[in-house]
Amino acid sequence: MDFGNPLDFVKSLTVAASGLKAQIGRMRIISENIANSDSVAATPGGDPYRRKIVTFSSELDRSLGVNVVKLGTVETDKSDFLIKHEPGNPAADANGDVKYPNVNTLIEMTDLRDAQRSYEANLNVVTATRRMLQRTIDIIKS
């Protein structure tokens, strides 16, 4: 009876685990963006928090011969800040304008939901692979 290559289970787990790790990093950055969405600069006329964007990269795991996903660079979004006229705000410049972060919480929440779904998909792969491995072991034992 041929049970396939046991390394196939390891490969599946390796790819899914790399996806889990990448999505955790993505969710961390998105959470940071949301947490800072209403912050202002520490000094009058200064720049507030700037939205961060995560990139991913694909790397070859030479020991297994599979591509895994890695958290790439974390870049800053260069789009304009939101400017509100609030002369009484301590962060206001000489004209009474306050810069707010270039974070759109609706976009961040959408990205967060997407990251959660990707995380869940990778977790389902880990769970299914573990079950298949356990069934294979049970068949071999009997």
Where in this protein do the model-derived segments appear?
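Amphipathic alpha-helical polymerization modules
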Residues: M1-S142
